[in-house]
Amino acid sequence: MNLDDLSHFSQIDTQDYLAEIDGLPDQLQRAWELGQQHALPGWSGFQRVVITGMGGSAIGADLLSAYATPNCPLPVVVHRNYGLPAWARGPETLLITSSHSGNTEETLTALQTGLERGCRILALCTGGKLAAAARQAGFPVWTFDHPGQPRAAVGYSFGLLLAAFSRLGLLPDPGAELANALEAMRQLQGSLRADIPVVRNPAKRLAGQLL
């Protein structure tokens, strides 16, 4: 396969994930900016954080949990299931429900359980039943616009969580570190884009070795 011949890419990459990858730095930056703009109560007094999500919607939660571990004073648990752990209850629990579509069954049951147990809740989604239920209960909903697959929205699922943790005082301000990361990502694109030939593209060379 000639990896410098872009004419056949659309036949293989039918959902245009190449464009999603190219847009990841901009997506992450947009998510951070949205996270600064969305409404958020001046909450405090949390003792634990639970982030619920399934599949692609949970990828950002895993990244946030790994990033937060050295600096967040609270335990952060990523929950991929129906309902909630038994210990997740009361206003000392911050429940963040993440669902790309807003209609994920497991995440909706987690929301309902959190409401019944008196947790404080932040919903992250593009809309759907999750947004409607959280708003009806009086909790903040942070929406974003992404028409693709959940696994291609990792910039949103991570960036919004990062902004929420920062604004709630659960993490030191990551703004400078994020800016450095975005710059590094964009610099890497200069050697990894599909239009960069194999001789100057380490990603294509690795792909060639795997084929």
Task: Give residue spans per PLM region.
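Helix-loop module immediately N-terminal to the HCX5R catalytic loop
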Residues: D26-A39, V76-A86
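Cofactor-/ligand-binding subdomain signature composed of acidic, glycine-rich
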Residues: M1-L34
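Glycine-rich phosphate-binding loops that contact phosphosugars or nucleotide phosphates
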Residues: S44-G190
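Compositionally biased, low-hydrophobicity segments enriched in charged and small polar residues
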Residues: M1-D4, A134, K204-A207
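Short, contiguous clusters of charged residues that form electrostatic/catalytic patches at enzyme active sites
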Residues: D26, R30, E105, G159, ...
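Mixed-charge, polar/low-complexity N-terminal
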Residues: N2-L3, H8, R30-W32, P75-V77, ...
